C-alpha cells in the first residue's frame, strides 16, 4: 500500500477501502522502509505497543492520534478522524466521521 500521494481519509479510503489507525500506521511505516523497532523509537513507543497499535489490538484517543500525527508528519485531522472512527466501529455504532476545523 503506497501512501505517498493522498490528501485526506476519504482519498485513502477511495484508493484502499476502509482505513483504520492500525492499517495507516503499518502502511506508513512500511512506505518509509522502517522496521517496527525503528518506527517505535521514532514515536517514543515500545515495539510491543506499536505492534498492538498496528494489529488493532489497542485503540488510541484523539489526543494521542494528534500527537502521533505530528511525530510522523501527517495532518492531525487524518489520524484523529481514523481514531474516532475506530472507536465507533469498536462500539458497533454505525456512523461515519467527517472532521472540519473549528473556527
Where are these regions (language model features)?
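Alpha-helix N-cap/N′ positions at the starts of helices
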Residues: 17-21, 45, 60
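Helix-turn-helix DNA-binding elements, focusing on the entry/boundary residues of the two helices
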Residues: 25, 36, 47, 62-65
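Short, basic-rich loop-to-helix N-cap that marks the start of a DNA-contacting helix
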Residues: 57-70
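Residue-level detection of the helix-turn-helix DNA-binding "recognition helix"
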Residues: 30, 44, 55-57, 84
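N-terminal flexible/basic segments that precede or flank functional cores
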Residues: 1-23, 27, 31-32, 72-81, ...
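Short Asp/Glu-rich motifs
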Residues: 48, 59, 88
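Short alpha-helical DNA-recognition segment
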Residues: 33-52
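The alpha-helix within a helix-turn-helix
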Residues: 29, 40, 69
Amino acid at each position: 500500500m503506497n501512501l505517498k500521494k493522498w490528501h485526506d481519509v476519504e482519498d485513502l479510503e477511495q484508493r484502499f477501502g476502509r482505513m483504520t489507525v492500525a492499517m495507516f500506521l503499518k502502511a506508513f511505516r512500511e512506505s518509509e522502509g522502517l522496521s517496527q523497532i525503528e518506527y517505535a523509537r521514532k514515536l517514543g513507543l515500545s515495539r510491543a505497543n506499536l505492534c498492538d497499535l498496528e494489529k488493532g489490538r489497542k485503540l488510541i484517543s484523539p489526543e494521542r492520534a494528534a500527537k502521533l500525527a505530528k511525530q510522523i508528519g501527517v495532518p492531525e485531522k487524518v489520524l484523529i478522524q481514523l481514531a474516532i472512527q475506530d472507536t465507533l466501529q469498536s462500539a458497533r455504532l454505525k456512523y461515519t466521521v467527517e472532521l472540519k476545523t473549528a473556527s
